[in-house]
Amino acid sequence: MKKTIIYSAAALLCGIVSCNNVETHPAEGSRTGFALSFFKNVNASAEPDENVVVSPYSAGVALSMLTQGAEGQTKVELDNALNGCDFKAEPLGTGDTVVVRSANSVWIDDDFSVRNHYVDVLEKEYDALATTLNFADPATVQAINNWCSEHTDGKVNEVISQLPSNIVMMLANAVYFKAPWLDQFNERATKDEVFHGQSGDRNVRMMNRKGRYAYAEYQGAKMIEIPYEGDRYSMYVILPPADLNMKNIGTYLNQSVYESAVKMLAPAEVRLSLPKMKIETSLNLNKTLKSMGVVTAYGSAADFKGISAMGPLSLGDVAQKCYIDVTESGTEAAAVTTISVALTSARPDMDVKVMKIDRPFLFLIVDKQSDNILFAGKIIDL
């Protein structure tokens, strides 16, 4: 049975406010750059037979809250991993038919003292809910899970099962997205078709529609933009060459290649086939973050004196759970990222294009008015 992993980069949703540049990072901060780097590193640490769905946006917000309490080399490494970006609270463009929301929280053990300034920053700049509870009480786990469920419309429920005795604080971000397609698929056109997955062929429910889409072909791949109502958010689907091993998709997650492909998108008549899918997965992001240079935070040299005078503190587990449901009417997606802190010692082409997504592919859900990527995914089996 194939394994499925949901990363906080599952579908890509871009936020409104551009990131703040940080002097410690050699390049100009870009949320797209962070999102693609995060997605690429998640893929590198995933098993070959795993689907990957992540929310780079949710991970970025949670890590930004952690960075506010970091100092010294620990802060430098976190800033660099974030590509110099700070994902502070921002409006995400909810409309009459499109629902996009993000919520933040910080949970503090009642035996642990947090600096007032740190809590003030989280409350004022990240609109975070700060709650002090007894971490030894099992009801605290339920309270955190209830908060996650409430802010993902019940799509992400049991985020944690226990709080180890050395955990004194937990940060959480929840993001929820629900939007109808600008041009919906006709359910009567949906039929059983073969998806040529990495582990073999399998019948799936394939949605079909012929219409006008922004479309591009580059480096042997195809890209299509499928807009949602309001035309602010879109899903970008990338169909790599049929003979490409999905372990080698790094080229298509290169920022310059991705941005060049988006600029190449041009109106075309497309016969589109897109599989229906509902995926729920969870992921531990520790290995991913270490591969992005966040090393000091996990050891005895961690510097989180901006959080508390009690210590020393170090980074515990960074985890993410995701959900995505793609149907004829639209898309619903949700993600929760948790961070535990431990006390330790081109021109239009009028030809009809065909884009049958019946083999492994990449997708991104983006906010075209901003530099955020909320969800991204690599689907190799259905």
What is the predicted role of each segment?
Residues I5-S8, C19-F135, N146, K368, ...:
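Detector for small/aliphatic-rich hydrophobic stretches
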Residues A11-L12:
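Repetitive helical segments and hydrophobic/amphipathic motifs
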Residues D49, E90-D243, K263-P348:
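Non-catalytic, conformational "gating/processing" segments within enzyme and secreted inhibitor domains
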Residues L78-L82, F185-V194, N248-S256:
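Short Gly/aromatic-enriched secondary-structure transition segments
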Residues D351:
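Long, His/Glu/Asp-enriched segments that create or flank divalent metal/ion-associated functional microenvironments
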Residues V354-R359:
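Short loop/turn motifs at secondary-structure junctions and domain boundaries
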Residues F361-L382:
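C-terminal or internal capping secondary-structure element at the end of a domain, subdomain, or sheet
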